[in-house]
Amino acid sequence: MTQNTLAVTQTFFYSHIHEYEESKIFLIGSSHFMPLNPEHMEKFILKDEVYSIFNLAESADNPNTRIRQLDSIIAADPDLIIYGLNYRDFSENSSTDFLLPGPKELIKQNVPLDIPSFLDNPKLGTLSAIRDFFKVETSGNYEIKTPFFKIEEYLFPIVTNKQLNKIVGSDMYIPIKEKNKQFQNFKSMMMKFKENNLKVVVILTPIRESSIDKISQINKDNFDLIITAISVSLNISVYSLMENYEDEEIWRNTNHITNDVPGLVFSEDVAKIILKEI
């Protein structure tokens, strides 16, 4: 993949990542990984060696889209890659119910600036964003640690377990691994990472039991076979947090942990896994 296939935010991040001399850890995944707080995790894993953690999660990400960044990730030479996966990462028609914010929220999240009138004048809003982008993203603080998404209000509200239990999930089609394009692209990335001596660990991200129950057994089995192939055939360590936090009120919907303070337990559990792997 060439650099010009990347979004502006991606190009900017990868072109500046070498300014960080510390050992680097990349968190890669979809919106399921957005609750992970890099600064909190850095304090949690503080050791003799200093690590800079970057949460590269993106809404609706999957292996088919992430592979566009493959060359850039390799060039960045992270010391460890934590890749978050769940059922939808290997599905072909996963429902977006309760998975993604609305269109306005998605635009706000992916436009580098907060532009209230963006939808009224998209052209002007886009030009303003490009003009001011570099002023916003070069601060070197929490924003550069979450370069591909903005910390928006919709990431914080906590839904009670009683309310969550009323939400009905839906099935999703997960092809067998031999015909699964998502898995084939994931496998290609993992092989390239290995060729370049990059260490990868997979974490299965949390999901409420009510969502899992709506997935048919054949699709669950296909997912399990894919995860087994990742663990055995690709020789990648896989940690599952899928069934964690079921009874804890830290969810903003059935598939996502809140970015608010109660959700930091997710960051801490991933940090514990990092400590085992570094």
Positions of predicted regions on the chain:
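Residue-level recognition of beta-strand->loop/alpha-helix junctions
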Residues: 55-57, 204, 240-242
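Membrane-embedded segments
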Residues: 27-28, 32-114
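N-terminal secretory targeting modules
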Residues: 1-24
